[in-house]
């Protein structure tokens, strides 16, 4: 309640252009996550030239086996527990923050989620399904008003099969997002040929896996998703269908370096200025079905 009141009071001042909720992936300690939040916000601020004044909410979490020294093979076998934990976060406290803060405030401020890896899994579960808990068990379940403008999922650790009603053949993805995830206007996902972390998981078809991107887009582009690519400067290459809920991007040219102190190839290369420019280019434009005649004041 204190967080909710503080954010509403801040938003009422009119000093902010956007509400940003960010959540990083597994093995991101709080200190590192805060540095990452600062890097993302700085990159967007530089690209926006003064038009980006965020009211920023950063969510940090660390799963079990989070030490950096763990062998990648052990990390792969930890997938089941981390996947379940991320879904549980989405069904609990991340879902509560979405329902009680982000969605209601989206009526007055353009609202975006910036997420990475298992953080994308938690955020999509929170927004596309909603919380399974209520703080006031005696009150009726009321669907909150509002919708998130855009959710960015960098190198996401969840499957796009969650948007389909088909029988699932992979473990840990037996979740369906109902109503076409109508609480989010646009979902933007990236993959990269240089990401070794999502490639290592063979028993789940992760959206961050480049091989999965190629196969999924061959069969579903123009139906569930619009598939294209983004260049090294953060500019989207070619054309895409803006009416599609999911924009699925080959970010091989953008997400290509190994960030210091990380492993998994380029899995964590999302904090450089071109990435901030990429995010800003999309949030500066209205999401599907929305006409915005003037920038937020």
Where are these regions (language model features)?
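Short hydrophobic segments within beta-strands
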Residues: 22-23, 114, 190
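Soluble non-cytosolic domains of exported or imported proteins
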Residues: 17, 30-35, 80-92, 117
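Active-site micro-motifs of SAM-dependent methyltransferase domains
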Residues: 28, 120, 158
